[in-house]
């Protein structure tokens, strides 16, 4: 069967679908990039925040409408289905199969059997599985689910308890990816700092990193989703000292007002977060620190928002993502009073991004005149397009490299940085 896969949402979905693609190929199916050729289409959805849910629903409706002109088997899976399967199945009857948060093996079997509906206790963590990857980088999921108690977050409601994969399983997957030519391994989970607590009775992310660092090959490792409340000195030391680890810290602090942080269910206050950032930079001044923040949380005042801006001024994050709060069914914050209007939340969002852009510009300027090791991934007639340790795929910037000689793509090269703006760097091959 010719199968097309449409992935929405976070990198964890991409990791699952890469595994699913490999399983389907092993079972004799053909994966097609042109949906017009597909006999079956799988849509992997996101159910985290309002904008992501809307994107998923719009995509489902688009494909449901396609069926008016050409018959094919339409399967919708993932987080949105896990949360709203009954409502969705009633509203969009054109979908042939609704599958919740299941392992890639279960998904493959359900599609082959044309299972119309399968939503049960989440079972996304897998040990041994084949692996497919069509990029120079690959997401590797080391755990799923979450045991944290952030008041705004619905993920534990549909992902379930935190579940780690074994070190051996992850090592085997990374080794296979390196063997097929992947140059950057990106470790993901809802909270990578919690890795191992359920299997080894303690967090062992640092041990996992040391094990993966021993794999032979010319590749690098990036770690995403480091919860600031549980990021330890050992973890920081491992990321800063191991030669295959990129000095990149993705630390979602969420806010800078102590009052709002407390209402969010976070543990560390703004001063402790600044101490964490200072500790990282004391180990590697050029380490990239990325964060995510939220505006419009219930009860957020002008003073709270100003404290967030003051915090960002002190923290000087290299990269930042900002979200506007939305009520999520079943969360503690959804029942909180003193909601912030959409207009005010949008104003704060736009003002924050403008404010942060100047910080990012000043941070990137420090690399002009320096040499950086970059991964060249694309080319045109005049330039190569690359990423440095500062740049996670899809969410950060890039390095534009003047084309002065032929190089292997993908490949690592040393580049002298010649210019910068708020998000991107320019450079020349050495």
Swiss-Prot record:
Pfam families: Radical_SAM, TRAM_2, UPF0004
Primary location class: cytoplasm
Sites where the protein binds [4Fe-4S] cluster 2: 146, 150, 153
An example Gene Ontology CC term for this record: cytosol
HAMAP family xrefs: MTTase_RimO
Domain TRAM: 365-430
Matching SUPFAM superfamilies: Radical SAM enzymes
Gene3D superfamilies documented for this protein: Methylthiotransferase, N-terminal domain (3.40.50.12160), Nucleic acid-binding proteins (2.40.50.140), tm_1862 like domain (3.80.30.20)
Protein's recorded name: Ribosomal protein uS12 methylthiotransferase RimO
Domain MTTase N-terminal: residue ranges: 1-116
Top-level EC class as recorded in UniProt: transferase
Organism lineage: Bacteria, Thermotogati, Thermotogota, Thermotogae, Thermotogales
Organism domain of life: Bacteria
UniProt GO molecular function: 4 iron, 4 sulfur cluster binding; aspartic acid methylthiotransferase activity; metal ion binding; protein methylthiotransferase activity
Keywords of this entry: 4Fe-4S, Cytoplasm, Iron, Iron-sulfur, Metal-binding, S-adenosyl-L-methionine, Transferase
Function in brief: Catalyzes the methylthiolation of an aspartic acid residue of ribosomal protein uS12.
Entry's family note: Belongs to the methylthiotransferase family. RimO subfamily.
Subcellular location: Cytoplasm
All residue ranges annotated as the Radical SAM core domain in the record: 132-362
Necessary cofactors: [4Fe-4S] cluster
GO biological process: tRNA modification
PANTHER family (UniProt xref): RIBOSOMAL PROTEIN S12 METHYLTHIOTRANSFERASE RIMO (PTHR43837), RIBOSOMAL PROTEIN US12 METHYLTHIOTRANSFERASE RIMO (PTHR43837:SF1)
């Amino acid at each position: 069967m010719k199968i097309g896969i449409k992935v929405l949402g976070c990198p964890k979905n991409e990791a699952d679908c890469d595994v699913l693609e490999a399983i389907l190929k092993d079972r004799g199916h053909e994966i097609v990039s042109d949906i017009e050729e597909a006999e079956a289409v799988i849509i992997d959805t996101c159910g985290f925040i309002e904008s992501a849910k809307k994107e998923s629903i719009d995509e489902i409706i688009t494909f449901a409408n396609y069926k008016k002109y050409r018959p094919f088997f339409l399967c919708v899976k993932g987080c949105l289905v896990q949360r709203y399967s009954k409502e969705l199945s009633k509203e969009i009857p054109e979908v042939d199969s609704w599958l919740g948060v299941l392992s890639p093996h279960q998904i493959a079997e359900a599609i082959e059997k044309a299972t119309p509906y399968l939503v049960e206790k989440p079972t996304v963590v897998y040990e041994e599985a084949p692996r497919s990857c069509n990029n120079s980088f690959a997401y590797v999921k080391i755990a799923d689910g979450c045991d944290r108690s952030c008041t705004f977050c619905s993920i534990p409601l549909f992902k379930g308890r935190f579940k780690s994969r074994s070190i051996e399983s992850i090592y085997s997957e990374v080794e296979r990816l390196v063997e097929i030519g992947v140059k950057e391994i990106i470790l993901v989970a809802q909270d990578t700092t919690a890795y191992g607590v359920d299997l080894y009775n303690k967090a062992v992310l640092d041990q996992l990193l040391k094990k993966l660092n021993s794999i032979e090959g010319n590749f690098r490792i990036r770690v995403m989703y480091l919860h600031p409340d549980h990021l330890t000195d050992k973890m920081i030391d491992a990321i800063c000292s191991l030669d295959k680890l990129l000095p990149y810290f993705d630390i979602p602090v969420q806010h800078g007002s102590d009052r709002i942080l407390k209402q969010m269910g976070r543990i560390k206050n703004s001063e402790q977060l600044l101490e964490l950032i200072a500790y990282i930079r004391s180990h590697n001044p050029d380490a990239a620190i990325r964060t995510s923040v939220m505006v419009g949380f219930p009860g957020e005042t002008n003073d709270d928002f100003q404290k967030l801006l003051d915090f960002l001024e002190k923290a000087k994050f290299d990269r930042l993502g900002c979200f506007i709060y939305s009520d999520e069914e079943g969360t503690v914050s959804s029942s909180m009073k003193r909601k912030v209007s959409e207009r005010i939340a949008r104003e704060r969002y736009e003002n924050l991004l403008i404010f942060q852009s100047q910080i990012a510009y000043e941070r990137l300027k420090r690399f002009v005149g320096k040499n950086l090791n970059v991964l060249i991934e694309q080319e045109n007639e005049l330039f190569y397009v690359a990423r440095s340790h500062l740049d996670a795929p899809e969410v950060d910037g890039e390095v534009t490299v003047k084309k002065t000689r032929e190089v292997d793509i993908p490949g690592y090269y040393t580049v002298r940085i010649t210019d910068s703006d708020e998000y991107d760097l320019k450079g020349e091959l050495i």
